[in-house]
Regions:
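Glycine-rich phosphate/cofactor-binding loops in nucleotide/flavin-utilizing enzymes
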Residues: 120-132, 136-140, 228-281
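A short, Trp-centered hydrophobic/proline-enriched beta-strand micro-motif
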Residues: 3-12, 55
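A short core secondary-structure module
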Residues: 33, 37-87
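C-terminal helix-coil-helix/basic helical segment that borders enzyme active sites and/or dimer interfaces
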Residues: 155-172, 183-239
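Glycine-rich beta->alpha junctions and the first turn(s) of the following alpha-helix
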Residues: 85-185, 257
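Glycine-rich phosphate/pyrophosphate-binding beta-alpha loops
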Residues: 16-18, 41-47, 94-95, 256-261
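Structural signature of FAD isoalloxazine-binding scaffolds in flavoprotein oxidoreductases
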Residues: 3, 19-23
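A structural signal for short hydrophobic beta-strand segments in well-ordered beta-sheet cores
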Residues: 27-28
Length: 281
């Protein structure tokens, strides 16, 4: 892998998030091409991407899960300019970084050969993509590093960190809990990686990893802010920001973790239904 091309996923729309199959972006067959119109939102790195895996509606008369197709859409032309008919607008997150975008398609033409799989069978391709995404979204190694850095801060800092832990013994317990939880997160990730190495596609196992890991991100950030005290509010790049402002950024950025790639509620539904065989509500 050369890493020369960046891809993004065109899934969510303003009125189709958790209910993804309600999406309205269309691809109409015109000879050897599809003509695409519609809008996607919360598209990660669309402003950098060379291609998009687009989930769109090719049969408006079919049941909503049955009339969808998976199409590769160029995001840039050969000169690196926006592909004709594609407009990308930034959406800054609360941490102040540009990761998300909204993407508009106006009579975008792509060849029929860009269809992935069979026409009107795109839902199954999208679900498979999400299973793979969720299996890789866990950040166990980074979580361990953050917790270990917080522990080291308490051990080495002269001032706020040690004082807060001595004044609030409950923080000692929180740090211990976070450390144990990062070990659990790592083991969940190992299970998913082992399945992938065996040629299996994780399903509810990926959802379990995503759910636990992303909610753990928020717990680590909350504990970190307690440990760092007022200095924890200092952002990256500021002189006195402890741990280079990582915890402040994590505190803000982790809010999106339990939304992107499927909300925590969606993950629990997947685990309950596909993993435990429980009936739907």
């Amino acid at each position: 892998l050369s890493g020369e091309h960046i891809w993004c996923q065109g899934f969510s729309e303003p009125n189709a998030g958790s209910d993804l199959a309600s999406l309205q972006t269309t691809a109409v067959r015109d000879g050897d091409e599809y003509v695409i119109n519609g809008q996607k939102i919360w598209t990660t790195v669309a402003h950098l991407a060379h291609y998009m895996l687009l989930l769109c509606r090719t049969d408006p008369n079919a049941p909503k899960h049955k009339g969808l197709s998976y199409i590769i859409v160029p995001m840039k032309d050969e000169k690196g300019n926006p592909y004709p008919g594609v407009t990308v607008q930034p959406l800054l997150n609360m941490a102040g970084t540009h990761e998300f975008n909204q993407v508009f398609f106006e009579n975008v033409r792509v060849p029929v050969k860009n269809l992935v799989g069979e026409e009107n069978q795109g839902w199954y391709m999208a679900v498979r993509t999400l299973d793979i995404e969720r299996s890789n979204i866990g950040s166990a190694v980074g979580q361990q590093q953050n917790v270990e850095d917080l522990i080291r801060f308490v051990q080495e800092a002269r001032g706020s960190g040690q004082e807060r832990v001595s004044l609030l013994p409950s923080l000692r317990y929180e740090l211990a809990e976070r450390w144990v939880e990062t070990e659990i997160s790592l083991l969940l990730s190992y299970r998913v990686v082992t399945m992938q190495n065996r040629g299996l596609i994780p399903n509810y196992e990926a959802s379990a990893t995503k759910l636990y890991s992303m909610e753990l991100n928020q717990r680590i950030a909350n504990t970190g802010m307690k440990v760092l005290g007022l200095y924890g509010q200092l952002a990256r790049g500021q002189k006195w920001a402890p741990l280079r402002g990582r915890i402040e950024f994590m505190y803000l950025r982790s809010v999106a973790n339990t939304i992107e790639g499927g909300t925590s509620e969606i993950q629990r539904n997947v685990i309950a239904g596909r993993g435990l065989g429980l009936p739907r509500d």
